[in-house]
Amino acid sequence: MSVRVLNPNAEVLNKSAALHMTINAAKGLQDVLKSNLGPKGTIKMLVGGSGDIKLTKDGNTLLKEMQIQNPTAIMIARTAVAQDDISGDGTTSTVIFIGELMKQSERCIDEGMHPRVLVDGFEIAKRATLQFLDTFKTPVVMGDEPDKEILKMVARTTLRTKLYEGLADQLTDIVVNSVLCIRKPQEPIDLFMVEIMHMRHKFDVDTRLVEGLVLDHGSRHPDMKRRAENCHILTCNVSLEYEKSEINAGFFYSNAEQREAMVTAERRSVDERVQKIIELKNKVCAGNDNSFVILNQKGIDPPSLDLLAREGIIALRRAKRRNMERLVLACGGEAVNSVDDLTPDCLGWAGLVYEHVLGEEKYTFVEQVKNPHSCTILIKGPNDHTIAQIKDAVRDGLRSVKNTLEDECVVLGAGAFEVAARQHLINEVKKTVQGRAQLGVEAFANALLVVPKTLAENAGLDTQDVIISLTSEHDKGNIVGLDLQDGEPVDPQLAGIFDNYSVKRQLINSGPVIASQLLLVDEVIRAGRNMRKPT
């Protein structure tokens, strides 16, 4: 009532109404996303306001693209998107886990239990589950020569949840090899050094890994070569065109001759820079059939392009800054900001540089490089929907391999961890908890089963039969997951189904925290400043 006195237009939901609104919002968001989970999950079609269509089963993409208005659902969506930003996967799992925690809590609250008691039980269960996760994980040695088979299994598990099996298996090698290509000992892995380029032609199975760089533009001079072998690569950030000064300066002249002299001086300055590059080319290419390629971040004007073309030099201008970094890592050499004191040590090397024309688009390939630490995943597909799906899957696959290398451990997948953690909480942890907080632990434990239940449901299996068979196997001491083909228990290690440790840890950490905060909401007040204005 006090809020109504201060603001008669305020909208207030009290106690049980606020709690049920919160729980229903969490359950509603769970129902939207749960059919996407796992290899057998379905695809959602998002239609934008302008009629554009997006097909995806990636939870992160769905939550970012959907227009969510309910405040509770917005809060859960932000948590799930943060999960993806931190660990690269687990968005859908986070949403359905929070939704299931709220659903389990609703049963207890309807029987008269106070939410605070449930929250205390959640906290106990969360700590116990995190401790259990540290004992359940499988250590993996990731030294200078990491185990590629484990990395492939992790990548395959992730990719199969986004794409059909044949394409996922093909992309597995591409994703693993690209991460190992950019990996340097004792340095963090920078996934931005993997360029993801797409070309809309051919089929999705034509996607390939280029150990080098693919640029989305070509040369701007008709007389320049379209293909060159044994190339010296000059990476530079030098203006080879007339440009205005960065400060407010002006030129003053009293007659036409002075103006012409100024124009000639400006042109001479640019030509001198070009000439220094040509001198370096003549120095390194004399007496052999090597070629010379310039990739410049700044502009090159037509007269300069003409001079370079006469010398047989391939020149590309306006390259992206990120590609300059990738080029140095792929080809070697160093990026230069001045043409003064150019030496052969500044140059990189590529065995092959060629231009590919696709319709009105031009692409330049830099391949056959030595010891590359940057690469390009070239995605191909017949339409934009296919390309977008592959892009989302590849990004998640790259993150999963990176997480495995950094965690140096994996977690058995196919729902094995969730079932094992649930049995641990029910059979061991619950007995040590005093009072009604036991019910909070039990609700948390049952909520963990939402992952294997949803996997079974999406595969068209009977969820009750699946859970009974899995829990009975775990009670016998066998760690098993769910085989989605026949619904039988399967050893995830033999089947090669592994999840990321960091993804599971983040899921167990964030899910109960958000659920606890939502359960303790006893009043929803809509009384912002804009509501005070008379209508």
Swiss-Prot record:
Keywords: ATP-binding, Chaperone, Cytoplasm, Nucleotide-binding. PROSITE patterns: TCP1_1, TCP1_2. GO terms for biological process: response to zinc ion. GO terms for molecular function: ATP binding; ATP hydrolysis activity; ATP-dependent protein folding chaperone; unfolded protein binding. It is found in: Cytoplasm. Gene3D superfamilies: GroEL, GroEL-like equatorial domain, TCP-1-like chaperonin intermediate domain. The keyword Cell inner membrane does not apply. It comes from the Eukaryota. InterPro entries: Chap_CCT_zeta, Chaperone_TCP-1, Chaperonin_TCP-1_CS, Cpn60/GroEL/TCP-1, GroEL-like_apical_dom_sf, GROEL-like_equatorial_sf, TCP-1-like_intermed_sf, TCP-1_chaperonin. GO terms for cellular component: cytoplasm; cytosol. Molecular chaperone; assists the folding of proteins upon ATP hydrolysis. Known to play a role, in vitro, in the folding of actin and tubulin. Heterooligomeric complex of about 850 to 900 kDa that forms two stacked rings, 12 to 16 nm in diameter. Belongs to the TCP-1 chaperonin family. This is T-complex protein 1 subunit zeta 1. It comes from Arabidopsis thaliana.
